[in-house]
């Protein structure tokens, strides 16, 4: 098969890539050998930083999706894909921006905006793809779930929905889409069990094995392999039907499967939090209520719940631990050594496996982009 070629880049009227305050979104036309024009959206935070979703960056992505939808509807585009850059797909929501929200109306508006933007990707009248090239955390994984098909890099090392760990829940569609993609039991594992197990994450192969991705490719040629696979899917109706039927069978999970998964989740929440943390219990309530609802009804529940949790003391405390305390002390440390003595940090070890240790590990991974190993006093390495 001839390799896909990029032919042009669409920009905003100002001549640059559409940009939000915390993320860039760039649209490139790729010519696929069989399918024709493919719209590839690349998200990046700029200057080597991972993309995150704030209101501004979501609106930037929405602007591009409106442009793409118009081209799709006029027959100019055969497929749509979204990917990231470097080692990151999307690093989730802009937590600092969420922390600054002061009222329920604003919090719910941000929750609703995520649904609107991701829904625009889902509603495209051509096959849609997420090429998960690296870390896909929280809202990053949720936007990937809004695509019809997904590829994942075998080198991706942080795929997760960690929201309950922070006092939130996956309120941009994850609560509805994930259990219908991988089954309720696996969804509880990803959304409840893993976050409460010191924020355990999936790697690319694990995500593929769970069914989050339809196929996995090695890193050096990940994008070109993903584009070639998309070309085959777009032009092979039988293959698309096979994937869709497999997905439909999982989405039609029995009442008993849902009951068992939710019950198992409640046991985990009780054992890990003694039911003192509202977010995981609220998530399980949404799963129980939403399993018989349509997507729009589930979205309303997610928006209300996420809005309330954004304003909760638990989330504010988590953000304080993540951002305020550590960053402020990093800027104004007491007894700091001479900066000339600083050396590059290539990896981090955290002794301890409790809540604070887990928060520190996640902070180091997000801010330093280096491997982090957690070791309990009486146990071996955990990550």
Spell out what each predicted region is:
Residues 57-61, 110-113, 302:
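Hydrophobic alpha-helical membrane-association signature
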Residues 2-40, 44, 49, 142, ...:
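Amphipathic alpha-helical segments at domain termini/boundaries
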Residues 36-45, 58-105, 116-133, 153-158, ...:
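A structural preference for short, pocket-lining loop segments at secondary-structure junctions
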Residues 82, 94, 143-144, 207, ...:
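Hydrophobic/aromatic residues within transmembrane alpha-helices
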Residues 341-383:
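Phosphate-binding active sites in nucleotide-utilizing proteins
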Residues 305-316:
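Long amphipathic alpha-helix in the N-terminal Rossmann-like dinucleotide-binding domain
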């Amino acid at each position: 098969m001839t390799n896909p070629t990029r032919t042009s880049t669409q920009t905003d009227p100002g001549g640059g890539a559409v940009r939000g305050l915390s993320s860039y979104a760039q649209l490139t036309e790729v010519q696929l050998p069989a399918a024709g024009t493919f719209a590839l959206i690349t998200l990046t935070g700029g200057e080597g930083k991972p993309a995150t979703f704030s209101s501004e960056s979501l609106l930037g992505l929405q602007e591009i999706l409106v442009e793409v939808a118009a081209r799709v509807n006029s027959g100019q585009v055969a497929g749509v894909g979204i990917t990231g850059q470097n080692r990151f797909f999307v690093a989730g929501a802009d937590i600092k921006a969420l922390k600054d929200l002061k009222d329920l109306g604003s919090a719910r508006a941000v929750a609703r905006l995520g649904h609107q933007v991701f829904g625009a990707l889902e509603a495209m009248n051509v096959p849609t793809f997420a090429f998960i090239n690296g870390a896909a955390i929280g809202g990053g994984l949720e936007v990937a779930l809004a695509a019809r098909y997904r590829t994942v890099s075998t080198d991706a090392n942080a795929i997760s929905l960690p929201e309950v760990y922070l006092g939130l829940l996956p309120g941009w569609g994850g609560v509805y889409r994930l259990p219908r993609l991988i089954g309720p039991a696996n969804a509880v594992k990803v959304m409840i069990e893993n976050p409460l197990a010191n924020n355990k994450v999936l790697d690319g192969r694990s995500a593929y094995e769970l069914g989050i991705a339809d196929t996995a490719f090695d890193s050096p040629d990940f994008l070109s392999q993903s584009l070639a696979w998309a070309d085959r899917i777009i032009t092979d109706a039988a293959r698309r039907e096979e994937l869709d039927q497999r997905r439909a069978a999982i989405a039609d999970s029995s009442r008993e499967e849902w009951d068992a998964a939710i019950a198992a989740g409640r046991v985990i929440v009780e054992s890990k939090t003694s039911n003192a943390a509202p977010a995981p219990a609220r998530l399980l309530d949404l799963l129980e209520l939403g399993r018989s609802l349509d997507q729009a009804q589930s979205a309303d529940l997610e928006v209300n719940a996420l809005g309330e949790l954004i304003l909760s003391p638990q989330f504010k405390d988590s953000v304080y631990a993540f951002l305020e305390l550590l960053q402020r002390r990093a800027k104004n440390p007491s007894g700091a050594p001479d900066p000339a003595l600083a050396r590059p940090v290539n990896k981090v070890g955290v002794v301890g496996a409790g809540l604070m240790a887990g928060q520190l590990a996640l902070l180091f991974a997000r801010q330093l982009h280096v491997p982090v190993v957690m070791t309990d006093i009486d146990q071996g390495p955990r990550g």
